[in-house]
Amino acid sequence: YDEDGNIYLEEKENLPVKLPTDIEFSGKGNPLETSEEFKNVILPNGKKGRRETDTMDTFVDSSWYYLRYLDSHNTEKPFEKENADSWTPVDQYIGGIEHAVMHLLYARFFHKALKDMGLVATNEPFKRLLTQGMVLGPSYYSQNERKFYFPKDVEIKDTKAFSKATGEELTVKIEKMSKSKNNGVDPEEIVKEYGADPARVFTLFAAPPEKELEWNVNGLAGAYRFINRLFLIISDSFEFADKNAGKENNYGIDLSKRSEKDEEIQKKLHQTVKKVTESIEDDFHFNTAIAAVMELLNDMTTYKQEVIDKNDVSTESKKIWKEVLDKVILLIAPFAPHIADELWEIIGNTTFTFEEEWPTFEEELTKEHKMNLVVQINGKIRETIPAKIGLPK
């Protein structure tokens, strides 16, 4: 640029313009601005000029970083085509909704340009996109003081919010959590009161990942109760399980010797393994995965009360309960890893849950074998008869 701001192109014989190597990176501002030799130039017309120092937007780098990661030590070229063809396209991209109109746009442009140049074989950089929702929380704004209050400085009376210091009624809105609005939550305080696992479970359970999540302390308390119930039922009943039964031989269960209650709890277990697996793998709906484990816990509680506590047991009951304990702990491990590892040790294991294989299910054991036949007379229900599915007319 000249002193009037007019733009001049660099002479072709001077290309490429190389950046100086003696720059000191202080962490403040634009490093090239500190190089007088690079910044100050003489224009072709003999006038003084100033060279552009904003030379590389970060999007230029981030638009192909996924390719460089595959060959980060290559000093001869950005990446080997063989590596790019082997690993791309990226299976899963996770980012905020703003990425759809910014980074993704630039990355696709770069990738398609690289394809045209013969440097990559794939036409698209990413297979699948997940845009996570925002975490929302109540903000408290003072019209008089023109500032946002921290929740700890607010008193709630009959659904209205007031400043503890001045008594002024505050304007309440549910908004994206941010420092500027003082409506964030301190993870350390949450962990101190409820523990890390309840915080994780609540965050994952409260909403699908692509939806907004409204922070709710009552939800945290619910997650805390759920984890405690799971811990208590397993720690109180693991002695009942057959310690020698294991996944190597499908726990040695003879399906023909199961009681009706045995059959029901095993069916619910295999349905839950299927539901959790599909919820995680297919659409990242961790909330429905956790909900499925909660349902299983209810059935486990009923089974414990009606079978274990009444000592109405058989050899198959003990084997099935061992399968239930093993698999429910592994199912909850991604969401509550600390409590899962504690329970894993309680039932006699010496490894960590993350070292174990993901539990499997048998499709046949997930099927319903009973149904209710409803008897209606003149449009009114008179009787409901339980019957096996497939019963001949």
Question: Where are each of the predicted segments found?
Answer:
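Short secondary-structure boundary/capping segments
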Residues: 142-149, 184, 217-219, 346-350
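Amphipathic alpha-helical transducer elements in NTP-driven molecular machines
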Residues: 184, 224-227, 393
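Cys/His-rich finger/ribbon microdomains and the adjacent scaffold used
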Residues: 1-96, 104-107, 112-182, 269-270, ...
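Conserved, non-catalytic sequence blocks in retroelement Pol enzymes and Pol-derived host proteins
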Residues: 96-99, 282-283
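Hydrophobic/anchoring residues in structured secondary elements
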Residues: 131, 386-387
